């Protein structure tokens, strides 16, 4: 495949991810406070709302990954994004608490966008370039996160809390059109047919327990992904509440909405810097395991800063360290997982990886409200501790990783 073709496909899928993330991040600073102010939801119920989304995504993640292997990346990406459009519209017009939960569950069930985007990138990228290329997804995330949360906070403050949901729905609809008209399918009809024929023997959770030589390293990677995500789940489900209770205590709703959005934009700027500049340079100097250690250590520092500070200016440093650490650690960990399986199983293993992440987020977001009720900084101390555990776990993993891929692509 010509490099020019790869570059064009890569740019197109990254544009899709950017627009998608722009829309999704619009609601990030708004939804918890919207639920609290409009529906009188407690912190425990608000974090359960977040948990419901990830529970649905956890159940559908491997299935979506296999669907993309069997029927192509583009059709699955389009269908999943249509579900997101519908869910955002439902959020804007939800008449009751039950409709809020239904909308988030629907988005979770159809929310296989990122799994498919990751599989798409691994399709068009040589093994030795996957850490860098997967990093570009997080760069697109970061770019979307620069504008999305700030714009969401501004729209909510200026026009009301439902407007960000409608704008997010428009952005998601734009992704559907962009995918339909601009994105090329990476799997040929023959490859999709072979994938369907191999379903009975395809990569599943059961195969991880069957004693295959690659099972232990992959299980350890999934466990590390679980632990690494735990801190993020605690943060993302409580950050708006934390901002209102601690960082912007005593400020008006408008100042709080805009301020939380701007702090989340710091996360986006940090992610963009990490993926477009920092990670590529670090990847030339350190191996994938070392990158995960470095990133997890920075994540620990970021969560500790959140637990200690009481002003938004100092909170920005927590956002900086956490986002840079997350950006350094995540792409190489995903790359390590795909290096263990055959080319035909990449979609499936990325689905498993995402399900491990989502399972962690289900648990962390479900208990985050209870922890927050005990004290607004408690979730951040717990997040710092789990990030530190990842550092030790990845050091142990390096002893079990093969020096070359365990499963090779079939000729």
Protein language model regions, located:
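Short amphipathic helix-loop junctions that connect adjacent transmembrane helices
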Residues: 30-43, 238-258
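Cytoplasmic helix-loop-helix junction between adjacent transmembrane helices
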Residues: 103-142
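Helix-breaking motifs and short loop linkers at transmembrane-helix boundaries and internal kinks
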Residues: 40, 72, 93-98, 309-310
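Juxtamembrane intracellular "pre-TM" segments in multi-pass secondary transporters
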Residues: 1-6, 184-221, 411
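Structural signature of the two symmetry-related core transmembrane helices
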Residues: 75-90, 290-304
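Helix-to-loop junctions at the C-terminal end of transmembrane segments
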Residues: 61-72, 273-287, 372
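C-terminal transmembrane helical hairpin of 12-TM major facilitator-type secondary transporters
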Residues: 289-333
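Residue-level signature of mid-helix packing/kink "hotspots" within the transmembrane helices
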Residues: 54-62, 112, 145-146, 268-276, ...
């Amino acid at each position: 495949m010509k490099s020019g073709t790869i570059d064009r496909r890569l740019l197109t899928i990254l544009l899709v991810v950017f627009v998608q993330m722009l829309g999704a991040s619009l609601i990030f600073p708004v939804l918890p406070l919207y639920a609290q102010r409009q529906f009188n939801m407690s912190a425990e119920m608000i974090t359960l709302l977040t948990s419901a989304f990830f529970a649905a995504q956890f159940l559908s993640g491997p299935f979506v990954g296999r669907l993309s292997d069997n029927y192509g990346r583009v059709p699955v990406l389009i269908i999943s994004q249509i579900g997101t459009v519908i869910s955002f519209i439902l959020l804007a017009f939800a008449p009751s608490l039950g409709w809020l939960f239904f909308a988030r569950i629907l988005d979770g069930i159809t929310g296989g966008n990122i799994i498919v985007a990751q599989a798409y990138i691994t399709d068009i990228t040589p093994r030795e370039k996957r850490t860098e290329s997967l990093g570009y997804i997080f760069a697109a995330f970061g770019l979307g996160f620069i504008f999305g949360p700030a714009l969401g906070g501004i729209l909510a403050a200026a026009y009301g809390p439902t407007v960000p949901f409608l704008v997010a729905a428009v952005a998601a609809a734009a992704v559907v059109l962009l995918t339909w008209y601009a994105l090329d399918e990476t799997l040929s009809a023959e490859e999709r047919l072979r994938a369907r024929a191999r379903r009975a023997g395809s990569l599943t959770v059961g195969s991880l327990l069957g004693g295959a030589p690659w099972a232990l390293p992959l299980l350890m990677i999934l466990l590390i992904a679980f632990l690494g995500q735990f801190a993020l789940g605690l943060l993302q489900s409580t950050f708006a509440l934390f901002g209102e209770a601690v960082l912007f205590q005593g400020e008006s709703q408008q100042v709080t909405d805009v301020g939380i959005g701007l702090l989340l934009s710091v996360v986006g700027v940090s992610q963009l810097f990490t993926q477009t500049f920092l990670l590529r340079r670090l990847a030339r100097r350190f191996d994938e395991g070392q990158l995960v250690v470095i990133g997890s250590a920075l994540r620990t520092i970021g969560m500790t800063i959140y637990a200690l500070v009481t002003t938004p200016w100092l909170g920005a440093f927590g956002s900086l360290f956490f986002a840079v650490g997350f950006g350094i650690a995540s792409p190489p960990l995903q790359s390590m997982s795909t290096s263990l399986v055959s080319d035909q199983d990449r979609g499936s293993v990325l689905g498993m990886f995402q399900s491990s992440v989502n399972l962690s987020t289900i648990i962390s977001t479900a208990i985050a409200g209870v922890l927050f009720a005990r004290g607004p900084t408690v979730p951040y101390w717990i997040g710092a501790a789990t990030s530190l555990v990842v550092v030790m776990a990845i050091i142990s993993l390096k002893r079990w990783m093969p020096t070359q891929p365990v499963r090779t692509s079939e000729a």
